[in-house]
Amino acid sequence: MESKLPLLVGVTGGLGSGKSMVCRYLASMGCALFEADVVAKELQVRDSKVIEGITALFGKEVYSYNPKGELQLNRKDIAQVVFSNQEKLGALNRLIHPRVAVAFQQACDNAARSNVAILVKEAAILFESGAHAGLDVVVVVQAATELRVERAVQKGLGTREEILRRLAVQWAPEKLAALADVVIDNNGTPEALYEKTKQLYEQLLQQAMLRR
């Protein structure tokens, strides 16, 4: 019997929007989850070509070894460079995103063989990197700027000023919303977000079942 691809769903949103929480909820409801940003971070310390490329871009001092002897990357230093240097940001993305795309294709193949109904792809820069191509549904999670800053600071992602600088170089919420199939407002409680995600899951499951 021929394996059928699952419904491919992209979830994105700016820093502090709550996209990761939506993805965790979807995973708890039975969706398979591909975390593009996690895969990208793994490539940065495991893929020899990526390591060579990052070293060429930012210098060998961005890498070090932890007490366990494992290679680690100083992402904070890199973030400070790329958020003020679009050329290096573009070079970094061109280095990593094609390899993430290969990993996602492998995840799609595995999901099809396992008869998975819905595969969710979480990515911070889904549209910006072109990673939305081929997806069936794209969900954008949004929240008020002040709330996003507060969440990011609470997570220890930087000071208020650092977070605001990062938000300033991300795509505007209006631009993301215009490209989305579904927009989820996350200005409320985690419980409210769960209910919205549950409704989304039920809609996605209906779409997935129609394909099988």
UniProtKB/Swiss-Prot annotation:
Task: Cite a single GO MF annotation.
Answer: dephospho-CoA kinase activity
Pfam families this protein is in?
CoaE (PF01121)
Q: Which reaction does it catalyse?
A: 3'-dephospho-CoA + ATP = ADP + CoA + H(+)
CDD domains in the record, alphabetically? Answer: DPCK
Name its pathway: Cofactor biosynthesis; coenzyme A biosynthesis; CoA from (R)-pantothenate: step 5/5
Q: What is its EC number?
A: 2.7.1.24
Q: What residues does the DPCK domain cover?
A: 8-212
Q: Name one GO cellular component term.
A: cytoplasm
- In terms of one coarse class, where is the protein primarily found? cytoplasm
NCBIfam families this protein is in? Answer: dephospho-CoA kinase
The role this protein plays is: Catalyzes the phosphorylation of the 3'-hydroxyl group of dephosphocoenzyme A to form coenzyme A.
The protein's name = Dephospho-CoA kinase
Gene encoding the protein: coaE
